[in-house]
């Protein structure tokens, strides 16, 4: 197996390895092409040895490069009351950052 890590960002967890492209919640102060550093590494596997953090693995960092800002699929919320001519339809599209994982430091 190739090395991978489990990181936490935006209150979500992602399993990543080098070269992966993931969509994460928006991060403040990050522009296109800039390096992104994820310091909350919960688990690492280097091909032979696994390290489980309590709650995070010390000295483990995942680095990536921001590729672009993307928008998620539209989520529709529809409310109605029968026989009352009451209909409300709203939509929401979440904004994400597309990040390419460049380096796992374990």
Curated annotation (Swiss-Prot):
Homology family: Belongs to the bacterial ribosomal protein bL21 family.
GO molecular function list: rRNA binding; structural constituent of ribosome
UniProt organism field: Chlamydia felis (strain Fe/C-56)
Subunit details: Part of the 50S ribosomal subunit. Contacts protein L20.
Classification via NCBIfam families: L21
Disulfide bonds: none
Gene of this entry: rplU
PANTHER family listed in its UniProt record: 50S RIBOSOMAL PROTEIN L21 (PTHR21349), LARGE RIBOSOMAL SUBUNIT PROTEIN BL21M (PTHR21349:SF0)
InterPro entries hit by this protein: bL21-like, bL21-like_sf, Ribosomal_bL21, Ribosomal_bL21_CS
Source organism, top-level taxon: Bacteria
Role description: This protein binds to 23S rRNA in the presence of protein L20.
UniProt keyword terms in alphabetical order: Ribonucleoprotein, Ribosomal protein, RNA-binding, rRNA-binding
HAMAP family the record matches: Ribosomal_bL21
UniProt protein name: Large ribosomal subunit protein bL21
GO terms, biological process: translation
Recorded GO CC terms: cytoplasm; ribonucleoprotein complex; ribosome
Pfam family, one: Ribosomal_L21p
Signal peptide range in chain numbering: none
PROSITE patterns: RIBOSOMAL_L21
């Amino acid at each position: 197996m190739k090395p991978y890590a489990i990181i936490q960002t935006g209150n979500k967890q992602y399993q990543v390895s080098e070269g992966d492209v993931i969509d994460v919640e928006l991060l403040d102060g990050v522009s296109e092409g800039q390096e992104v550093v994820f310091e909350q590494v919960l688990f690492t596997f280097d091909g032979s040895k696994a390290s489980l953090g309590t709650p995070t693995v010390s000295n483990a960092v995942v680095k990536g490069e921001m590729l672009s800002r993307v928008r998620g699929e539209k989520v529709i919320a529809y409310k109605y009351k029968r026989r009352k001519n009451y209909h409300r339809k709203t939509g929401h599209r979440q904004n994400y950052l597309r990040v390419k994982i460049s380096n796992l430091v374990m």
